[in-house]
Swiss-Prot record:
Residue ranges, annotated region (Disordered): 1-52, 213-278
Protein name: Protein lyl-1
Domain named bHLH: residues: 149-201
UniProt source species: Rattus norvegicus (Rat)
GO molecular function ontology, one term from the record: protein dimerization activity
Compositional bias ranges of the Pro residues kind: 27-40
Primary localization class, coarse: nucleus
PROSITE patterns referenced in this protein's UniProt entry, alphabetically: BHLH
Subunit structure: Efficient DNA binding requires dimerization with another bHLH protein.
SMART domains to which the protein is assigned, alphabetical: HLH (SM00353)
Length: 278
């Protein structure tokens, strides 16, 4: 039998260990190393023989009273070392729900362009222009046929205007002389060549008008216009008589008392010209 002092030491050690195990966390304790089957120290063998005489020989027995001092307390640094990791795991476990609040499953219904911008948006809504998608355009067009009709009319009018402008440029291009006749010109070149060509024609007409105005013209080259009527016939008759009198030959002996035979002027011109002719 063991002495009462040894039994008291063993009992106190066992109670301390049970209290420490109960107060510790449920973390698994490291497995204890099995005792080697080698020979035991002489002190343990003597103590085993004295305290536990009922155990068979060869069974290893560890004396708790000698391995750990009685007044020593188990350090809690190893148990407290696991607590920060548990807190970190708990914090990480609660983080995904906060991110899930800002996650939009459908980009069409909740997007940056339509819905309110979250804290993770790069640009504010004031700088972004709303551009509806194709599906939204179809929905809007289906509910507003007037806008569709107005859009179709605007597109057709713009197409018609563009066709007329192109036709006018083609007609103007045909009137412009170019060195290669089949030279392709842009609209800008057509307009510039048209301006130059029009200016050239204006200068040409101006020069021709100046030449015609400053040209020499004889005073008797132009014939008076023929007037029909009694006055015109009388003038024509008097003129014919004057020409006939001038064309008659004058004889040298037929002079009125002029022995020298000098030619006297014929006074028929004065008699022929009546006051009406003058």
């Amino acid at each position: 039998m063991c002495p009462p002092q040894a039994q008291a030491e063993v009992g106190s050690a066992m109670t301390e260990k049970t209290e420490m195990v109960c107060t510790s966390s449920p973390a698994p304790a490291p497995p204890s190393k099995p005792a080697s089957p080698g020979p035991l120290p002489a002190e343990e063998v003597d103590h085993r023989n004295t305290c536990n005489p009922w155990l068979p020989p060869g069974v290893p027995v560890i004396n708790l009273g000698h391995t750990r001092p009685t007044g020593a307390a188990m350090p809690t640094t190893e148990l407290s070392a696991f607590r920060p990791s548990l807190l970190q795991l708990a914090a990480l476990g609660t983080a995904p729900p906060t991110l899930a609040l800002h996650y939009h499953p459908h980009p069409f219904l909740n997007s940056v362009y339509i819905g309110p911008a979250g804290p993770f948006s790069i640009f504010p809504n004031s700088r972004l222009k709303r551009r509806p998608s194709h599906g939204e355009l179809d929905l809007v067009d289906g509910h507003q046929p007037q806008k569709v009709a107005r859009r179709v009319f605007t597109n057709s009018r713009e197409r018609w205007r563009q066709q007329h402008v192109n036709g006018a440029f083609a007609e103007l291009r045909k009137l412009l002389p170019t060195h290669p006749p089949d030279r392709k010109l842009s609209k800008n070149e057509v307009l510039r060549l048209a301006m130059k060509y029009i200016g050239f024609l204006v200068r040409l007409l101006r020069d021709q008008a100046a030449v015609l105005a400053s040209g020499p013209s004889a005073p008797g080259s132009r014939k008076p216009p023929a007037h029909r009527g009694v006055e015109g016939n009388a003038r024509c008759g008097a003129g014919h008589r004057v020409e006939a009198a001038r064309s008659q030959p004058v004889l040298p002996g037929d002079c009125d008392g002029d022995p020298n035979g000098s030619v006297r002027p014929i006074k028929m011109e004065q008699t022929a010209l009546s006051p009406e002719v003058r």
